[in-house]
Amino acid sequence: MMSAEETVTQNAPNTVQDQVEASVDAAVHASAEQSNTPAQQADDFRVFVGRLSTSTKKSEIRSLFETVGTVRKVTIPFRRVRRGTRLVPSGIAFVTFNNQEDVDKAIETLNGKTLDDREIVVQKARPVQEQPIKDRKKSKNKNGEEPETSTSVENAESAKGSSDENEANTATAPSSNEANGVDKKQNEIKGKGGSGKNKAKPLPPNSIYVSGLSVTLTNEGLKEMFDAYNPTRARIAVRSLPPYIIRRIKLRGEQRRGRGFGFVSFANAEDQSRAIEEMNGKQVGDLTLVVKSAVFREDKQNDENEKNENEPIEASESAPTNVSDSTEPKASEVDSEEKSGVTASAITA
């Protein structure tokens, strides 16, 4: 028969083990309950703020909403500017309160109020559970901080965090796939032109180079000037302009200002020769025409003869033998509407 001391000694380990297991179970159960409650409360006590100015700061929003209750946090989603990596405020925000009473009061009191000269909208935020699940990626701004962003109201409303500085949705920076897509597109554009630069295309046979033209002369005017020699086409070399300016000019039905020279093509060599002989040196208004034959230059520079003997030389790389550099034509600057066959590969006397 065991003594009382032996019985206590034998049962002690089981008693301690039972107590430890019970305390662990209780702690796990309590933590599970606590993990669900704050998230649900954060979702229930949020309001959506719209029509904000992009210059409005968190502190200004917090100051306004603290007039109706205690503000737990303020979230301003950001969005990525199209075709860039710069982030700008999306013009909305989310304010989280501690209770439903403050939420109702904020909606009733602050909806329609003016903040930074903007009449804001205050509404109940949609719970996260009702929002569609979307992929989210993180990126960092120049300071190494994770910026807030939102490509839609749904994404913005799903933002969570523990403080005002680290609480918002993160921006989606251009991924490597997107970057590759841009590079691929650029390569395709380059592929069409052979290289990144605009290659000069050879002029049709029997073409001439004409300088001393008015900068306001149009293609039609140039062709009419040589009408007696049966020209097949005429093109003015135009000034380089940004693409958006070119689009505006075309929308207005206007022609870009010329550079004072152009090219005219003829049906046969006889008409070309007559045009050069009769029009070279002719006075047109205050200007004197210089008319020369536009042909391929077969010789370039010493070591490049064999390499480029069959390739057309861009007009920007060569000029008439007795024409100044100021009138040197660039193939990329001739009217883009009729590029093929218009730009001179080279011009010689």
UniProtKB/Swiss-Prot annotation:
Output the InterPro entries linked to this UniProt entry.
Nucleotide-bd_a/b_plait_sf, RBD_domain_sf, RRM_dom, RRM_MRD1_RNA_proc_ribogen
Chain coiled-coil ranges: none
- Where are residues bearing Phosphoserine located in the sequence? S152
Q: Does the keyword Cell membrane apply?
A: no
Per the UniProt entry, what is one GO biological process? mRNA cis splicing, via spliceosome
Instruction: Give residue ranges for domain RRM.
Output: 45-127, 206-296
- Give the main location: cytoplasm
Question: What protein am I looking at?
Answer: Single-stranded TG1-3 DNA-binding protein
